[in-house]
Curated annotation (Swiss-Prot):
UniProt keywords, alphabetically: Lipid metabolism
InterPro entries reported in the protein's UniProt record: EF-hand-dom_pair, EH_dom
Annotated protein name in UniProt: Increased rDNA silencing protein 4
Residue pairs linked by disulfide bridges in the UniProt entry: none
Region Disordered: start-end pairs: 1-25, 38-57, 62-92, 147-260, 275-315, 516-579, 717-738
One Pfam family per UniProt: EH
GO cellular component: cytoplasm; plasma membrane
Residue stretches of biased makeup (Low complexity): 167-181, 228-237, 567-579, 720-730
Start-end of Acidic residues biased regions: 532-548
Function per UniProt: Positive regulator of phosphatidylinositol 4,5-bisphosphate turnover and negatively regulates signaling through the cell integrity pathway. Involved in rDNA silencing.
GO biological process: endocytosis; lipid metabolic process
Native species: Candida glabrata (strain ATCC 2001 / BCRC 20586 / JCM 3761 / NBRC 0622 / NRRL Y-65 / CBS 138) (Yeast)
Length: 870
C-alpha cells in the first residue's frame, strides 16, 4: 500500500514537473538536492562540504557528474554544449550506502536536466561519496567561468577595436568635410566603414584611445545607426579651402588613419602657401596633389532612402538669408567680400586675400549672349561672416562666387541707366542687388496672366452678347507709337523704387507701327483714324480691329470698323471739315447716316462714330466670312417659323430637332455613300444624262470632214426651223417628198438618227470636267463608240456618262459592256429586271423598314409606360 501510494505520488509529481516552466523546474531540482544532502549527512555523519551547494547551478553540475544514475537517456544535440535548453529529462536514483537501504527513506525520483559544457569538463570522481560529487561540480563550474571570461574579453576587445576605428574615421571625415565646397553638408557625413577587426593595427589601437563612458557609448551607437544608412565610402576633399579634383577621389576605407598619431601626422603634413592655394588630397600614398584650376566635384544629392534629390541653387541659398541677419550686417558700398577668410574654419585672413568686384555673370534670357560685349555682374554688397551664414550657406557662397580678381563690375549708376533704357539683364542685376528690398510702382498688365485672360474673356463676351461703351474702350487704347518709360529711384530709406507709366496699357497687334512713330502731333481722333490703310485685304485689319466692339440689334449685328477706306465716299467723309460733333450710331439695318461737305445728313451705307467712317456689314457678309469653303454640295436646311415660342406649344420643337435627321443628300467629297451599285443605269441617272445630251447635241458638226458644205434650201412651209446655210444647224429637218433637188443631201439628212448626234470633241470636253486621266477617258470612249465616225448617238453618250460616274465612285472599267446597260438607256424600256441586284436592294430596304418598325414599337412602348405612370 505504501509503495502504491509512492508510485502514484511520483507519477503526479512527474506530470506537474512536465507542465512547470524552466525556473520552477530548477527550483524543484535544488530543493531535491538539499534534501538529498541532508539525508547523506545524517547517514554518513560527515561535516558539510566546503563547497557551497546553495546555488541551483552548482547542484545541477553535481547531479550531472554523479555516477549512480539509472535510466539515463542519450541527450539530443550533443554538439551544442553551451545550450541552456532542455537536452533531455533523466530519472536519477541515488542510494545512500550499503547499510542505509532500510533505515533511510527512499528518495523520490526527480527529473534532472543534464547540461554538458564540454567533453573535457566532466570529471569522474574516484569516490562515490557526496563530497566527491560536490567537488567535481565545483571544478566544472570553475572551468566554465574561465571559458565565459575568455569569451567576454574577446568581445570587449572586438568592440574596442570597432570603436577606435570609428574614432579615426570620424576625425578624418570631419577634417576633410570642414572645407568641402560645392556640395551640401549631407554629402560629407562620415559613414561606418567595414574594417577587418583581426588586423594588428586595430588591436593595437585600443591601447592609445581611452574607453568612453556609458552615456557616450549610447550616443555613439545611435550615431552609428544613422551612419550605417549611408554609403561605406567617403570622397576625400581638400583640407584648406581648395576644391578637390574629380580624378583624385579616394575611398576613406583605404586611407583611414589607425590611431591618433596617424591623424596628427596627416594634419601636420598640410601646408598652404600664401601666394597660391594648393589642394591636398588624401590618397593611398598620402601625397599632395596641386590643382591649378579649382574644379567642383558635382555629385547628386540623395536621401537616406537612396532617392536622388535636386541640389539647391547657390543663388537661392544666398537669397534665403533672413532679414535680421541682413540688418545686422548692413551694406558695403565697396562691393567686396570682407572677412572672406572667416568662411573657412581654421584659416586666417593672411592665407586668403580679399577679393573685390567678384560677382556672377548675368546673361540675356533670350539668346544667352552677353550684352554689348561686356559682362554685367552682380556686385555682392553684403559683408558676410561665419557668424551670419550657416555652414551650408557658406559652402554655397563659395561655390557660387568665382574667385577671379580680374572680373570687373558695373557701378550702380550705370546699371540704373541701362535698366531705364530697357536693358533686361541690367534690370535683373539691379534687382538682385537688394534682393527683396525693391518697391514697384506701376504694373504691366500684359505680363500678368490673370489680367490678360480677363481682358480676353471680356472681349469675347462683348462680341457675343454686345453692350458696353465703345468710347471708354477706345479712349483706353494705346497709340501705336507708345514707348513705355521706366524710372528707377531711391527713397529716403535707401530702398530702390521702380516707377512705370504702363498703367492701363493695351498693346496693338498690328505691324504698321513704324509708319506713325515720328508723328507727335496726333490727337485721339487722329490716332484712331491712323488704323485705316489703303489696302483692301481684310487680313491686315483683323489684328488692328480685334478688340474693337460692335453692337447688335434684333435684325442683324454690325461691326464698327471701316475696312474699305479706299471707297471714295468714305475718303470724302474722312476729309470732311464741317464735322464738329459726334453722331450716334444708326441702329437701322437698312440705311446709314453720313455728313457731306455742306453739313446735310444723307442716307448712305456708312455711319460716323467718333470721326471714323464705318460701313455697315450685312448679315450675308458676316455669315459668309465664318463659313468654311468646301467642294461638297451644301444641303438646304428647311427653316420653321418659331410660332411655338409665342403660343406656348411645344410639339413643334420635336419636329425642329428631327427635321434633318433622316435627310440624305449627295456628297461630292464622299460619293460612295450615296452610290447604289445596281449594274445598270437607273431612271434618275438616265434623266440627268439626257439633260446633258439635249443641251449639247448638234454642236459643231460642220467640223466633221464628211459633213456636206452645200447650202440646203428649205421649203417655205418649214419656216419654224429657220434653216441656215450651215448644215450643222439643220436640227433633223426633213424635206418634203415633192422636192427632188439635191437628192444626196436629202438622203443624208434623212439618214441621221432621230435623237441627233454629238461631236466627239464636245463629249470629251464634258467628260474632262470629271478630272479623270485622259487614258481612262479614251478607254471609255472606245467602249461606247459604235458609229466610228467621230460622233456619238444618244445611247452611247448616256452610257459614257454613266461609266464616268462609275469611275468616280471607284469602280473599274469592264472589258465589255453588259447588254442590260444598253437596254437601261433605251427610251422604250421602262425597267430592267436584275434578279441578283434587285434582291440585294430589296433586302436592304427590308432591313431599313424593320429598323424603323422596331423604333416605332419602342417609342410606342415608352409612351404607354409614361401614360400608365401618369
Amino acid at each position: 500500500m505504501h509503495m502504491r501510494l509512492n508510485k502514484r505520488r511520483r507519477n503526479h509529481v512527474q506530470e506537474q514537473m512536465s507542465e512547470l516552466p524552466q525556473d520552477a523546474k530548477n527550483d524543484s531540482l535544488a530543493a531535491a538536492q538539499v534534501i538529498f544532502k541532508r539525508h547523506a549527512d545524517n547517514a554518513n555523519s560527515t561535516p558539510p562540504s566546503p563547497v557551497g551547494l546553495d546555488s541551483a547551478g552548482h547542484l545541477d553540475k553535481q547531479a550531472d557528474t554523479a555516477q549512480r544514475v539509472h535510466k539515463v537517456g542519450t541527450p539530443s544535440g550533443t554538439s551544442s554544449s553551451h545550450n541552456s535548453g532542455n537536452e533531455g529529462m533523466h530519472k536519477v536514483t541515488k542510494p545512500l550506502g550499503e547499510n542505509t537501504a532500510t533505515t533511510a527513506p527512499i528518495a523520490i525520483k526527480q527529473p534532472v536536466r543534464v547540461v554538458r559544457a564540454s567533453p573535457t569538463a566532466i570529471v569522474s570522481p574516484t569516490s562515490h561519496t557526496p563530497l566527491d560529487a560536490a567537488t567535481a561540480a565545483a571544478n566544472v563550474v570553475a572551468e566554465k567561468s574561465k571559458i565565459r571570461t575568455t569569451q567576454q574579453q574577446l568581445q570587449d576587445k572586438k568592440r574596442r577595436d570597432i570603436e577606435n576605428a570609428h574614432h579615426a574615421a570620424s576625425a578624418a571625415a570631419v577634417t576633410s568635410s570642414n572645407l568641402a565646397v560645392g556640395s551640401p553638408p549631407s554629402q560629407y557625413i562620415p559613414s561606418v566603414p567595414t574594417l577587418n577587426v583581426t588586423s594588428p593595427q586595430m588591436r593595437n589601437s585600443s591601447q592609445n584611445i581611452d574607453r568612453r563612458s556609458k552615456s557616450n557609448e549610447e550616443a555613439h551607437n545611435g550615431h552609428e545607426k544613422m551612419m550605417n544608412s549611408r554609403s561605406n565610402s567617403i570622397n576625400s576633399s581638400t583640407i584648406k579651402g581648395s576644391v578637390s579634383e574629380p580624378n583624385t577621389v579616394t575611398p576613406l576605407r583605404q586611407n583611414s588613419p589607425s590611431n591618433m598619431d596617424d591623424i596628427i601626422q596627416k594634419m601636420e603634413a598640410v601646408d598652404i602657401d600664401e601666394g597660391r592655394k594648393n589642394s591636398f588630397v588624401m590618397n593611398g600614398s598620402g601625397d599632395s596633389v596641386d590643382s591649378l584650376k579649382p574644379n567642383v566635384v558635382r555629385r547628386p544629392m540623395r536621401t537616406p532612402s537612396g532617392r536622388r534629390v535636386r541640389p539647391p541653387s547657390p543663388i537661392d541659398k544666398i537669397g534665403s538669408i533672413q532679414e535680421p541677419h541682413l540688418e545686422s550686417t548692413g551694406f558695403n558700398d565697396q562691393n567686396d567680400f570682407s572677412e572672406m577668410s572667416s568662411l573657412i574654419d581654421g584659416s586666417s585672413s593672411e592665407d586668403i586675400t580679399k577679393i573685390r568686384g567678384s560677382g556672377i555673370r548675368e546673361r540675356s534670357p533670350v539668346d544667352g549672349v552677353e550684352h554689348g560685349g561686356m559682362s554685367v555682374n552682380i556686385p555682392m554688397q553684403r559683408s558676410l561672416s561665419s557668424d551670419v551664414l550657416s555652414p551650408s550657406q557658406q559652402a554655397a557662397m563659395v561655390a557660387a562666387t568665382k574667385l577671379s580678381p580680374s572680373t570687373q563690375t558695373l557701378p550702380v549708376e550705370e546699371l540704373e541707366y541701362l535698366a531705364s533704357t530697357g536693358d533686361v539683364s541690367a534690370y535683373k542685376a539691379l534687382n538682385k542687388i537688394n534682393g527683396t528690398n525693391m518697391a514697384y510702382k506701376g504694373t504691366i498688365p500684359d505680363l500678368i496672366p490673370s489680367r490678360a485672360r480677363a481682358q480676353k474673356t471680356s472681349k469675347l463676351k462683348f462680341k457675343i452678347f454686345g453692350g458696353g461703351k465703345n468710347s471708354d474702350r477706345r479712349n483706353n487704347a494705346t497709340p501705336i507709337g507708345y514707348d513705355p518709360v521706366m524710372n528707377i529711384s531711391t527713397d529716403f530709406g535707401g530702398k530702390k523704387v521702380v516707377e512705370s507709366n504702363q498703367n492701363n496699357v493695351k498693346f496693338k497687334t498690328t505691324m504698321r507701327s513704324q509708319k506713325y512713330l515720328g508723328n507727335d502731333n496726333l490727337d485721339d481722333n487722329d490716332l484712331r483714324t491712323q488704323y485705316i490703310d489703303d489696302d483692301d485685304d481684310d487680313d491686315d485689319y483683323d489684328s488692328a480691329y480685334e478688340d474693337l466692339d460692335y453692337s447688335r440689334d434684333d435684325s442683324e449685328a454690325m461691326y464698327k470698323g471701316d475696312r474699305e477706306s479706299s471707297n471714295p465716299r468714305s475718303n470724302s467723309l474722312l476729309q470732311s471739315s464741317s464735322y464738329s460733333g459726334k453722331v450716334g450710331f444708326n441702329s437701322n439695318a437698312n440705311s446709314g447716316t453720313s455728313i457731306n461737305n455742306s453739313g446735310n445728313v444723307s442716307n448712305l451705307d456708312y455711319s460716323l462714330r467718333d470721326g471714323v467712317a464705318e460701313k455697315k456689314k450685312s448679315r450675308r457678309d458676316k455669315i459668309k466670312k465664318k463659313l468654311k469653303s468646301t467642294a461638297s454640295v451644301v444641303p438646304y436646311y428647311p427653316h420653321y417659323a418659331l410660332t411655338h415660342l409665342a403660343s406656348g406649344v411645344s410639339t413643334v420643337n420635336s419636329n425642329l430637332n428631327n427635321s434633318n435627321k433622316n435627310t440624305k443628300w449627295f456628297n461630292e467629297d464622299k460619293p460612295w455613300k450615296s452610290h447604289k451599285d445596281v449594274g445598270f443605269v437607273t431612271s434618275q441617272e438616265r434623266k440627268r444624262y439626257e439633260a446633258m445630251w439635249v443641251t449639247n447635241r448638234y454642236l459643231y458638226l460642220n467640223l466633221l470632214p464628211w459633213w456636206p458644205k452645200e447650202e440646203v434650201e428649205k421649203d417655205e412651209d418649214d419656216s419654224a426651223s429657220n434653216l441656215n446655210s450651215n448644215a450643222s444647224t439643220n436640227v433633223g429637218g426633213v424635206l418634203s417628198d415633192g422636192d427632188n433637188e439635191e437628192d444626196d443631201v436629202t438622203r443624208f439628212l434623212l439618214s441621221l438618227p432621230a435623237d441627233g448626234l454629238m461631236l466627239n470633241l464636245v463629249a470629251k470636253d464634258i467628260w474632262e470636267r470629271s478630272n479623270l486621266p485622259n487614258d481612262l477617258l479614251k478607254q471609255i470612249y472606245d467602249l461606247v463608240d459604235t458609229r466610228k465616225d467621230g460622233t456619238l448617238n444618244r445611247e452611247s453618250f448616256l452610257v459614257g456618262m454613266w461609266l464616268v460616274d462609275q469611275c468616280l465612285y471607284g469602280r473599274k472599267l469592264p472589258q465589255e459592256l453588259d447588254p442590260k446597260i444598253w437596254d437601261s438607256v433605251d427610251r422604250w424600256v421602262l425597267n430592267v429586271v436584275n434578279s441578283t441586284m434587285m434582291t440585294a436592294l430589296e433586302r436592304k430596304q427590308k432591313k431599313k423598314m424593320m429598323k424603323k418598325e422596331l423604333k416605332n414599337i419602342k417609342r410606342e412602348q415608352k409612351q404607354a409606360i409614361a401614360e400608365q405612370h401618369n
